[in-house]
């Protein structure tokens, strides 16, 4: 946490750290940064991408009206100015002059109008459309109640447009840095249709970097490169001519390549690997605003069996599973560097109106109590007329921390809850995303990283009907608390906003609707010669715009 930034009437912590601030100048023979990610890029379509690893790439080749800087500010990017009305409902945006796409097309206000309407169009199916909910008309369009023309955005000229909000949103400038708010070149999207963003040659770029035909991303390959974008308005600030990405799912391989000088950045994802490399030059730990948690299928369909379906709808069963979770031991065994979760919103992301860490303020009693867990388990089974139960637990098998966590939980649950059989379902990360989104699971180990530094980036996930509410539960208490925090009149009173968000956390806990496991940290090895790389614990994790090897 670098700086607490007060925006309007809400307190937001923009968590950002600039790593090894630049000193000196680049050499004429610059070495390309070799950067690894642990799983495949799913998409470059900024309207529909959902995972952090796709964002780590897309966020460096695309850009929005704002970009979070090294001090945690929502700094102007494509926008030359953003003027806000006194009531906080109207934003007048003026774009920088002579903006261009990487293909030479002019980037204009119409590209934002098109993109935002595409995002909220139900036909697009964007899971991030809910982030557009701050804009007037968006929610009714998403739900199919209104036409696209009612969205609160209007192009006044090629370089100016106005935005009307549904409610004052103190963190709206941070939302403008999110991929779903990025512009799109309609000509290119129309050309490729549903194939847009499925490979780098079917995408166009406006950010610091771009793809070329050389070392392109085909949609499936493990090695690809991005290059400095000559049409980028701030190209003098881009310090690397080329950055090479490698998809390396085996963390041991990544560590070996780092020590051989073939990688400059790699994540360490197993306990043994972390302990073995704590004294390795370049070892560091990135604290993320991210929570790993278990979702329970409460939709009434698509569970592994009728018994599983009715069991997960039973609060005693869910509470027993929560109480049988030894979070401290999970962290010690499978997730070194992380900390046991005490709420859904993670520690270190935002502060209350009094300056207290929000997660500390909203802490719930997510404790380990195997005795009480057994009692509730027996009670739940009796209510259901069962003596034994089989549940599946799905996790990303190509991500070592997820696999290790799932293995630990399988053993712990079967030991603590008599009659329970846990069937592990370890699948590729992409499939885990799809299964969760389609409700094809009993229990799934999920993770959420904050898109901006305010509790709503976490708590809006579980409102009734929200696209990321994969368990499909509904709580009026939760919905009412979240609505009160984010709408007038209380949205304008920070202390009341804090109270309502805390009430939402309490509703999650009391209903045992989810099971928070840990607040995530990412141990990594990074070449000490890398300078100018900015790490953000929310939004774009690794901003490579000014990064290079000195």
Swiss-Prot record:
Disulfide bonds: none annotated. The lineage of its organism: Bacteria, Bacillati, Bacillota, Bacilli, Lactobacillales. It is found in: Cell membrane. The gene is dppA. Gene3D superfamilies: Dipeptide-binding Protein, Domain 1, Dipeptide-binding Protein, Domain 3, Periplasmic binding protein-like II. One of its GO terms (biological process) is peptide transport. This is Dipeptide-binding protein. It holds the Pfam family SBP_bac_5. A lipid is attached at residue 23 (N-palmitoyl cysteine). SUPFAM superfamilies: Periplasmic binding protein-like II (SSF53850). The keyword Transmembrane helix does not apply. Induction: Expression is regulated by the peptide content of the growth media. Part of the ABC transporter DppABCDF involved in dipeptide transport. Binds di- and tripeptides with high affinity. Requires a free N-terminal alpha-amino group and an alpha-peptide bound contiguous with the N-terminal amino group, has a strong selectivity for L-residues, and shows preference for dipeptides containing methionine or arginine, followed by hydrophobic tripeptides consisting of leucine or valine residues. It is a lipid-anchor.
């Amino acid at each position: 946490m670098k700086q607490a930034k007060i925006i309007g009437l809400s307190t937001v912590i923009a968590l950002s750290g600039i790593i090894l601030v630049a000193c000196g100048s680049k050499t004429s023979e610059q070495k390309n940064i070799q950067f690894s990610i642990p799983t495949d890029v799913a998409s470059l379509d900024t309207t529909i991408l959902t995972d952090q690893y796709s964002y780590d790439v897309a966020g460096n080749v695309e850009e929005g009206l704002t970009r979070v800087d090294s001090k945690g500010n929502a700094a102007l990017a494509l926008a030359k100015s953003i003027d806000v009305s006194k009531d906080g409902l109207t934003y007048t945006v003026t774009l920088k002059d002579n903006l261009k796409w990487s293909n030479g097309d002019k980037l204009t206000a119409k590209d934002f109008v098109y993109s935002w309407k595409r995002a909220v169009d139900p036909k697009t199916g964007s899971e991030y459309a809910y982030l557009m909910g701050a804009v007037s008309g968006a929610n009714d369009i998403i739900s199919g109640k209104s036409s696209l023309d009612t969205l609160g955005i209007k192009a006044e000229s090629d370089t100016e447009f106005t935005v009307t909000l549904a409610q004052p949103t103190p963190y709206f400038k941070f939302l403008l840095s999110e991929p779903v708010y990025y512009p799109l070149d309609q000509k290119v999207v129309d050309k490729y249709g549903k194939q847009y963003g499925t490979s780098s040659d079917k995408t166009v770029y406006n950010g610091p970097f771009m793809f070329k035909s050389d070392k392109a991303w085909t949609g499936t390959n493990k090695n690809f490169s991005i290059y400095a974008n000559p049409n980028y308005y701030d190209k003098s600030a881009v310090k690397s001519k080329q950055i090479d990405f490698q998809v390396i799912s085996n963390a041991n391989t990544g560590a070996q390549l780092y020590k051989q000088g073939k990688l400059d950045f790699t994540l360490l994802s197993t306990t043994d690997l972390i302990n073995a490399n704590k004294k390795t030059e370049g070892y560091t730990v990135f604290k993320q605003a991210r929570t790993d948690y278990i979702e329970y299928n409460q939709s009434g369909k698509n569970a592994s069996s009728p018994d599983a379906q009715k069991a997960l709808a039973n609060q005693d069963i869910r509470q027993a599973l929560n109480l049988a979770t030894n979070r401290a031991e999970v962290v010690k065994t499978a997730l070194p560097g992380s900390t046991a979760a005490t709420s859904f919103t993670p520690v270190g992301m935002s502060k209350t109106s009094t300056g207290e860490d929000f997660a500390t303020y909203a802490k719930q009693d997510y404790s380990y109590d195997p005795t009480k867990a057994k009692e509730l388990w027996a009670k739940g089974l009796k209510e259901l007329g069962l003596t034994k139960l089989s549940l599946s637990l799905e996790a990303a098998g190509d991500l070592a921390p997820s696999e290790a966590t799932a293995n630990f939980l399988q053993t712990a649950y079967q030991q603590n809850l008599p009659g329970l059989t846990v069937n592990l379902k370890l699948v590729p990360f992409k499939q885990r995303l799809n299964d969760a989104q389609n409700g094809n699971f009993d229990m799934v180990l999920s993770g959420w990283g904050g898109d901006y530094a305010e509790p709503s980036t976490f708590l809006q996930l579980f409102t009734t009907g929200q696209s990321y509410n994969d368990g499909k539960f509904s709580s009026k208490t939760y919905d009412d608390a979240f609505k009160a925090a984010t709408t007038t009149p209380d949205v304008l009173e920070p202390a009341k906003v804090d109270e309502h968000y805390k009430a939402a956390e309490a509703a999650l806990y009391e209903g045992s609707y989810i099971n928070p496991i840990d607040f995530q940290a990412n141990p990594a090895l990074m070449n000490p010669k890398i300078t100018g790389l900015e790490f953000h614990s929310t939004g774009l994790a690794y901003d490579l715009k000014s990064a290079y090897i000195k």
